[in-house]
């Protein structure tokens, strides 16, 4: 009887020890992140997504993909994420987000920097997500930008280059048209389908306009250096809705949100989803806080274009490019 009691006690002790053993380490979640093309702004979004997830204490394995501006490649990436059974997929820019949403019917799809998610068919309303889809919009105040460009640079004819086969750019074009009508400015447009055409498009309109306005067209920004070179030689000003590219010099004025912060905002949505919240319950997020935005004036470019910038604009800018150097206030 004593032997049985000792054996029973030993079993109980082992059971108790087992109950206090360290829990098994959970497997890292699998997250696919794809961008339509590589340029600094989208790289910043990607970095922000990853940092937000890391800061939330979530261990993750990433499959990072770049479609190189090709819609067919975007579809292949979506199928790759499907076969790998990722726990969540992030689409940076409209074409890749649409490809993911088309292919992944049950996997959470979080889009980042999509100008018009309703127009792109990703969601039916901005009030909440759609089934397994939600995300962050990079809509910018186009009409205000055009009015500001007119006030500061005195332009009467405005150039605009857009990607004709990208939903994001088609939506932006309508806003540019509206902004020009309201400001009483003539609009000259040139369409492209790939980054190789950006320089040729810039050359086609540079002598017909007083300046050019850039929205967040990813194909244009993937070849931004060639456009800046063309307009720089002609001493014509550039206004950009993306501040990232302007930090290298040559772009007269830029106003837009910080893309790294936009990436973090997108990553925070991913964290919500990984923690159990349904995409359909999460509204589309916008970067509306003033601290999310930057305003840059390039005084070197202004001087080259013969533009005198009023002190009130210089005072309101949080970044000044002068004498080949960027200064942050």
Language-model-detected regions and their locations in the chain:
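Positively charged n-region of N-terminal signal peptides that target proteins for export
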Residues: 1-4
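Hydrophobic h-region of N-terminal signal peptides that target proteins for export
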Residues: 11-19
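Short hydrophobic alpha-helices and adjacent helix-cap/hinge residues
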Residues: 21-329
């Amino acid at each position: 009887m004593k032997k049985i009691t000792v054996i029973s006690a030993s079993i109980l002790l082992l059971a108790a020890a087992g109950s206090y053993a360290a829990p098994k380490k959970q497997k890292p979640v699998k997250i696919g992140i794809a961008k339509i093309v590589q340029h600094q702004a989208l790289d910043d979004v990607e970095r922000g997504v990853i940092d937000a997830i890391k800061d939330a204490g979530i261990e993750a394995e990433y499959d990072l993909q770049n479609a190189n501006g090709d819609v067919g490649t975007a579809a292949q990436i979506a199928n790759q994420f499907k076969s790998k059974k990722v726990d969540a997929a992030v689409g940076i820019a409209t074409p890749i987000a649409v490809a993911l949403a088309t292919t992944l019917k049950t996997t959470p799809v979080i889009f980042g920097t999509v100008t018009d998610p309703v127009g792109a068919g990703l969601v039916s309303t901005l009030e909440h997500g759609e089934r397994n889809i939600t995300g962050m919009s990079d809509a910018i105040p186009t009409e205000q930008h055009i009015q500001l460009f007119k006030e500061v640079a005195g332009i009467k004819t405005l150039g605009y280059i857009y990607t004709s086969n990208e939903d994001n750019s088609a939506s932006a074009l309508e806003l540019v048209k509206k902004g020009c009508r309201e400001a009483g400015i003539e609009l000259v447009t040139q369409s492209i389908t790939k980054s190789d055409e950006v320089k040729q498009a810039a050359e086609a309109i540079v002598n017909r306009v007083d300046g050019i306005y850039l929205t967040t067209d990813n194909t244009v920004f993937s070849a931004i250096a060639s456009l800046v070179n063309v307009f720089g030689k002609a001493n014509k000003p550039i206004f950009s809705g993306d501040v990232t590219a302007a930090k290298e010099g040559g772009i007269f004025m830029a106003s837009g949100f910080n893309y790294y912060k936009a990436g973090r905002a997108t990553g925070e949505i991913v964290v919500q989803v990984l923690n159990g919240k349904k995409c359909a319950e999460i509204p589309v997020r916008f970067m509306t806080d003033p601290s999310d935005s930057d305003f840059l004036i390039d005084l070197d470019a202004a001087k080259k274009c013969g533009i005198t910038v009023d002190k009130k604009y210089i005072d309101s800018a949080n970044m000044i490019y002068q004498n080949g150097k960027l200064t942050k206030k």
